[in-house]
Amino acid sequence: MRRTILSSILVLLSTMAFAQSSSPESLYERGMDAITGIGPTRNDMQGIDYFRRSADLGFGPAQIALAYYYETGTAIAGSQSQALDLYRKAAQQGDPLAGWLAGRRYFLGNGVQRDPDAAQKWLKVAADQNNAYGAYYMGRLMADRDYTKAPKLYKIAADQGLPQAQYFYAKTLQDGRGIAQDRFAAYVWFSIAADAGYAVAGTGLGELESGGYLTTDQVSEAKAKARDMEQVVIRAVTARGCSGWDGEFDEFPTPPPPKLQRYCH
């Protein structure tokens, strides 16, 4: 009797262990281990296989990771339609990373016909969760659809350290478009963006300086305020975590690679 009970327990434990190892979360983590391995332990194709199995079980992060490979044609044949389908599936689950990546495709007309309504639908998933990239893209979209909403969206992303958003937020302040004109604040945000390496922000600084809109004392004060705010922004970037890939600071940010995506959900 005791032997029968012990055998039953062992079978149950074995079944539970197998189920756990085959869960979508576990498959996703095994995929991450495969693509982030060093030297001979790295195996992108094995990682993609794990992502595919997890994605087939409806796990959003795996769907996004697999979509990246389809979108970029990295390691597998590219398929823009499959990439978009996977992004949408994950966005339907409320994943903010998927929201901005799906919305980005419709906003840019990247692999799909440009569709501002669809872009707004998917970007909203991300922007409503204060996702920096979703808010930035939504700001760019709303600049043409309802410009009064753009500054607030830019500010969400600017506070989280996106120099593109800092630049466009400064532009709205400089021009008084959708927000009260404030050239002093514009100078501060142009300075922050320029210090982050967003070169075009230097043009905004030059326009404000050459136009005589600020006194010498105001310029000095704005520069000092920018330096103080940069420390706050740096802490926000650290807290955000989703950073560190080529294309991150392009005018239209590109998708983060799977090894960084785990920090972006």
Segments from the language model and where they lie:
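Bacterial N-terminal signal peptides
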Residues: 7-15
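Positively charged n-region of N-terminal signal peptides that target proteins for export
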Residues: 1-4
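Terminal, low-structured helical/coil segments at or just beyond the last alpha-helical repeat
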Residues: 24, 202-265
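Boundary/linker segments of alpha-helical solenoid repeat arrays
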Residues: 61, 94-98, 130-134, 161-168, ...
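Structural signature of tandem alpha-helical TPR/SEL1-like repeats
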Residues: 41-50, 77-89, 113-122, 144-153, ...
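Short helix-capping/linker turns of helical repeat alpha-solenoids
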Residues: 22-23, 36-38, 43, 56-60, ...
